[in-house]
Amino acid sequence: MVAKIIDGRAVAQQVRSEVAARIQARLKAGKRAPGLAVVLVGGDPASQIYVASKRKACEDVGFISLSYDLPNTVTEAALLALIDQLNADHRVNGILVQLPLPAGIDNISVLERIAPDKDVDGFHPYNVGRLCQRAPLLRPCTPRGIVTLLERYHIDTFGLNAVVVGASNIVGRPMSLELLLAGCTVTVTHRFTRDLRRHIENADLLVVAVGKASFIPGEWIKPGAVVMDVGINRLESGKVVGDVDYASAAERAAYITPVPGGVGPMTVATLIQNTLQACEDYHDTTMPEA
C-alpha cells in the first residue's frame, strides 16, 4: 500500500481563497475588513518567522494587520495593558499573542486576558470549555485545521479508533475533543503512557504532536490508517521532518500528511478563518463602517 498524500498547502490555499472572497463581498457591502492584532514579545527567531507568515497571510486575504513588537524586557503588566487596549479597540476582531513568552511572564494570565470573542488562537479557557461542552465557538487552530483536512479529503471519522500522541494544551488536548466531536473513540497518549506501540498499532486515525524527529517508526502504523503528523523538526543537515518516519509510514498508511506541507499550512489558514468568524459572529454590530 502506498499512502495518499494529504496536501495541506493546497487545502490551505483553498481556505484562504474562500476567506478572501468573503472579504471582498464585505467590502462591496460597505463593511470594514476584519482586523487582526499580532503581538510578538522578544526576538526569538522561530517566533519571528511564524509571526511574519501570519501577518503576510492576513494581508494576502485583505485583513487589516496590526503589529505590536515588544522587547523581551517588557513587563507582564505592560503586556496586559496592551491586551486591554486591544480588547477595547473596535478595529480589532482578533488578538494573537505569539508563544512562547519570555521568562517572568505568565502565559496563562496573558491568554486569559484576551477577550474570548477575540481569542482567535482558541486558547482561552472559555473557548476550550465550549469545545469540551460540544458547542465550539473559536476553536484552537491546529486541531481545527486537521479536522478541515479530514473533511476536505472526505475521510469518514465516525467509529474510528483515534490515537493522539502528545497531550499539550495547544494540540493534543483540544485535538482529542475535536475527534470526539467527529465521532471517534479517542485515546490520548503522553510521556507516562505504557506500551505506546500497542496503542498506535490499534489506531485507525493517528495524530502525532511531540516535537521529536521520526519518533514513530512506520512499522507501528496500522495498515490502512490515516496519519496526521503535526511535528516540525529541523535536523542538523537542515532537512525538516515530522514526528513520524514518513517513508516507512507511507508504505502502510492509507492517508498521510507530509512535513513540510501537511498540517503546518492549515494552522495559519485556520487563524484566518477564526478571525473572519470572530468579525462576522461577534463584532459586526460594533465595527465602524468602511
Swiss-Prot record:
<keyword id="KW-0511">Multifunctional enzyme</keyword>
<keyword id="KW-0486">Methionine biosynthesis</keyword>
<dbReference type="GO" id="GO:0004477">
    <property type="term" value="F:methenyltetrahydrofolate cyclohydrolase activity"/>
</dbReference>
<keyword id="KW-0378">Hydrolase</keyword>
<dbReference type="GO" id="GO:0009086">
    <property type="term" value="P:methionine biosynthetic process"/>
</dbReference>
<comment type="similarity">
    <text>Belongs to the tetrahydrofolate dehydrogenase/cyclohydrolase family.</text>
</comment>
<dbReference type="InterPro" id="IPR020631">
    <property type="entry name" value="THF_DH/CycHdrlase_NAD-bd_dom"/>
</dbReference>
<protein>
    <recommendedName>
        <fullName>Bifunctional protein FolD</fullName>
        <ecNumber>1.5.1.5</ecNumber>
        <ecNumber>3.5.4.9</ecNumber>
    </recommendedName>
</protein>
<feature type="binding site">
    <location>
        <position position="232"/>
    </location>
    <ligand>
        <name>NADP(+)</name>
    </ligand>
</feature>
<dbReference type="GO" id="GO:0004488">
    <property type="term" value="F:methylenetetrahydrofolate dehydrogenase (NADP+) activity"/>
</dbReference>
<dbReference type="InterPro" id="IPR020630">
    <property type="entry name" value="THF_DH/CycHdrlase_cat_dom"/>
</dbReference>
<keyword id="KW-0368">Histidine biosynthesis</keyword>
<comment type="pathway">
    <text>One-carbon metabolism; tetrahydrofolate interconversion.</text>
</comment>
<dbReference type="GO" id="GO:0035999">
    <property type="term" value="P:tetrahydrofolate interconversion"/>
</dbReference>
<keyword id="KW-0554">One-carbon metabolism</keyword>
<keyword id="KW-0521">NADP</keyword>
<comment type="subunit">
    <text>Homodimer.</text>
</comment>
<dbReference type="Pfam" id="PF02882">
    <property type="entry name" value="THF_DHG_CYH_C"/>
</dbReference>
<comment type="function">
    <text>Catalyzes the oxidation of 5,10-methylenetetrahydrofolate to 5,10-methenyltetrahydrofolate and then the hydrolysis of 5,10-methenyltetrahydrofolate to 10-formyltetrahydrofolate.</text>
</comment>
<feature type="binding site">
    <location>
        <begin position="166"/>
        <end position="168"/>
    </location>
    <ligand>
        <name>NADP(+)</name>
    </ligand>
</feature>
<dbReference type="GO" id="GO:0000105">
    <property type="term" value="P:L-histidine biosynthetic process"/>
</dbReference>
<keyword id="KW-0560">Oxidoreductase</keyword>
<dbReference type="InterPro" id="IPR000672">
    <property type="entry name" value="THF_DH/CycHdrlase"/>
</dbReference>
<dbReference type="GO" id="GO:0006164">
    <property type="term" value="P:purine nucleotide biosynthetic process"/>
</dbReference>
<keyword id="KW-0028">Amino-acid biosynthesis</keyword>
<dbReference type="InterPro" id="IPR046346">
    <property type="entry name" value="Aminoacid_DH-like_N_sf"/>
</dbReference>
<keyword id="KW-0658">Purine biosynthesis</keyword>
<dbReference type="GO" id="GO:0005829">
    <property type="term" value="C:cytosol"/>
</dbReference>
<dbReference type="InterPro" id="IPR020867">
    <property type="entry name" value="THF_DH/CycHdrlase_CS"/>
</dbReference>
<dbReference type="InterPro" id="IPR036291">
    <property type="entry name" value="NAD(P)-bd_dom_sf"/>
</dbReference>
<dbReference type="Pfam" id="PF00763">
    <property type="entry name" value="THF_DHG_CYH"/>
</dbReference>
